[in-house]
């Protein structure tokens, strides 16, 4: 059995993303932004073609390549079932909570489970920049 990897994942994002992200985390889903990229086709492209798939999408949108694209890369490609994720600021900014990735499914806005869809009101959902989700379980809160 491979040793698990450890990741730090800071939750932030557009207006209302913080609140919805924390609701998702309470319900067992870790989230990341990139809603403009959110599709299962994009996930498959990243898994097959690596970071170049992210870079290509950036360039199609006429965006300059930025370092934060590596956060999306780690979320989609490097995080695996059994890995641990340290999330600062949840439930408060003074502490870190630890979660474990429970499977290798990556959800996007075109295949999200009903329990994700039901979180947040319509106004929050429209304004939040959330695009990808991973199922997690709590290991330790408020460390």
Label each region the model flagged.
Residues 94-143:
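Aromatic- and Lys/Arg-enriched surface recognition patch
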Residues 73-80:
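Short, well-ordered loop/turn sites that connect or cap secondary structure elements
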Residues 12-16, 92, 142:
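Conserved nucleotide-binding/hydrolysis micro-motifs of P-loop NTPases
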Residues 83-85:
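Structural motif
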Residues 80-81, 94:
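Short connector loops at helix/strand junctions that flank enzyme active sites
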Residues 1-72:
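Compositionally biased, charged N-terminal/linker segments
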């Amino acid at each position: 059995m491979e040793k698990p990897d450890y990741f730090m994942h800071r939750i932030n994002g557009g207006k209302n993303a913080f609140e919805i992200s924390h609701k998702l985390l309470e319900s067992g889903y870790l989230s990341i932004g990139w809603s403009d990229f959110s599709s299962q086709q994009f996930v498959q492209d990243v898994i097959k073609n690596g970071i170049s798939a992210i870079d290509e999408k950036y360039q199609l949108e006429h965006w300059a390549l930025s370092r934060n694209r590596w956060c999306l890369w780690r979320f989609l490609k490097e995080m695996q079932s059994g890995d641990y994720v340290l999330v600062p600021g949840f439930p408060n900014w003074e502490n870190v909570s630890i979660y474990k990735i429970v499977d290798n499914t990556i959800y996007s806005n075109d295949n999200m489970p009903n329990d994700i869809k039901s979180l947040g009101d319509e106004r929050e959902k429209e304004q939040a920049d959330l695009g990808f989700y991973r199922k997690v379980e709590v290991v330790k809160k408020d460390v």
